[in-house]
Amino acid sequence: MGAAGSSALARLGLPALPGPRWLGVAALGLAAVALGAVAWRRARPGRRRRLQQVGTVSELWIYPIKSCKGVSVDAAECTALGLRSGHLRDRFWLVIKEDGHMVTGRQEPQLVLVSITYEDDCLILRAPGMDQLVLPTKLLSSNKLHDCRVFGLDIQGRDCGDEAAQWFTSFLKTDAFRLVQFEKNMKARASNEIFPSLDKNYQVAYPDCSPVMILSEASLADLNTRMEKKVKINNFRPNIVVTGCSAFEEDTWDELLIGNVEMKKILACPRCIMTTVDPDTGVIDRKEPLETLKSYRLCDPSEKSIYKSSPLFGIYYSVEKIGSLKVGDPVYQMVQ
C-alpha cells in the first residue's frame, strides 16, 4: 500500500492491519479513492483528465494584513480572491500612507513583527512594545473610502479608524499611516492590468500578483543546503505548503486539484527584497537569501522580459473552481 496509503488510514483513525483485515481496509480505501475520482470526473464532464498525486498539503497560511505575520489554519475556503477562514481573508487589509500609497515590509520591515489572532469577529494585533489593538472585521459604512495605489494600480480601501492609524504610526515611527480594508463590493485589481502580456483572467485585492502562492518544503530544504544562515518558510509567505515532492517539482504543476479546489498556474514567483526581511527580528538584510537564489534560480533567457533578474521560488496560481481545502489533503496534478 505504501506510505501514502498508510497515512490515509491514519487520517481515518484506522491502524495498518496485517493479513486479510488489512486487505479489507485497503479495498475500502481504494474504493473511496475511485468514487472520489468518478465524482470529480462527473463534475467536470468536458475535461477528461487523470489525477496524479504530486504531494500533500502540510501547511495553510492566511496573511490578513499585507506584510504582517501570517495566521496558520488547518482548513480554509478558497475563493476567487484567495484563502478565507471565517472573516480572516488573505491580504484584505493594507497599511497605506496618507496619500494612499501602499506600505509593505520592503519600506517598513518591522511590519513583519505584527502578529494577528482572530477572536469574536475581531482581529487582535500585537507588536513589540505596543498594547494590543482590537480591530473589528466589519466596518461602518460611514468610514472614509481611500483611493489607494498598489504597485501603480488603483484600488479602494475602507479606513479602519483613527485608533488603528495611530497604532501603526506609533509602532513604525517613520511617517503617518492609515490601515484600510478591502470589501467584497469593491473593484479588485485585474490580471490584465498586473500582467498585460499574459493571457490570464483573475482578480486580486492587495496581494502582489495572484490569489494563491504555493511552495514546497523540499524547495526550501534545497535552498537551506546552500545557505550559511538558514531561512524559514515565513521568509517567502506562501499560502499553501506542500510536502512529499522533490525540490522545485512545483515548477511543473500547471493545473492542480486540492480538496475540491481547482487552480491554474499563472507563472513562477519572482522574488524581491522582501525575502531578506528576517521574520523574527524585522531587520532587512538586503542580500540573503536573494543572492543565493540568484546563483541558481534565474529564469530561462527567453523569459527575461517577464522575470528580468529576479530569482524564481514558488508558483502563483489562479483559482479556477472555488471550494475548500485542508491540511492533509492530497495535491493532484490534472494531466491529459
Swiss-Prot record:
The keyword ATP-binding does not apply. InterPro entries: MoCF_Sase_C, MOCOS_middle, Pyrv_Knase-like_insert_dom_sf. It is a peripheral membrane protein. It is found in: Mitochondrion outer membrane; Peroxisome. Component of a complex composed of cytochrome b5, NADH-cytochrome b5 reductase (CYB5R3) and MTARC2. This is Mitochondrial amidoxime reducing component 2. GO terms for biological process: cellular detoxification of nitrogen compound; nitrate metabolic process; nitric oxide biosynthetic process. Transmembrane segments: none annotated. Residues 1-35 form a transit peptide. It catalyses: N(omega)-hydroxy-L-arginine + 2 Fe(II)-[cytochrome b5] + 2 H(+) = L-arginine + 2 Fe(III)-[cytochrome b5] + H2O. Residues 188-334 form the MOSC domain. Binds 1 Mo-molybdopterin (Mo-MPT) cofactor per subunit. PANTHER family: MITOCHONDRIAL AMIDOXIME REDUCING COMPONENT 2, MOLYBDOPTERIN COFACTOR SULFURASE MOSC. There is a cross-link at K138, K144, K173, K187, K287, K294 (Glycyl lysine isopeptide (Lys-Gly) (interchain with G-Cter in ubiquitin)). One of its GO terms (cellular component) is mitochondrial outer membrane. Keywords: Isopeptide bond, Membrane, Mitochondrion, Mitochondrion outer membrane, Molybdenum, Oxidoreductase, Peroxisome, Transit peptide, Ubl conjugation. Ubiquitinated by PRKN during mitophagy, leading to its degradation and enhancement of mitophagy. Deubiquitinated by USP30. Catalyzes the reduction of N-oxygenated molecules, acting as a counterpart of cytochrome P450 and flavin-containing monooxygenases in metabolic cycles. As a component of prodrug-converting system, reduces a multitude of N-hydroxylated prodrugs particularly amidoximes, leading to increased drug bioavailability. May be involved in mitochondrial N(omega)-hydroxy-L-arginine (NOHA) reduction, regulating endogenous nitric oxide levels and biosynthesis. It comes from Bos taurus (Bovine). It is an enzyme of class 1 (oxidoreductase). GO terms for molecular function: molybdenum ion binding; molybdopterin cofactor binding; nitrate reductase activity; nitrite reductase activity; pyridoxal phosphate binding.
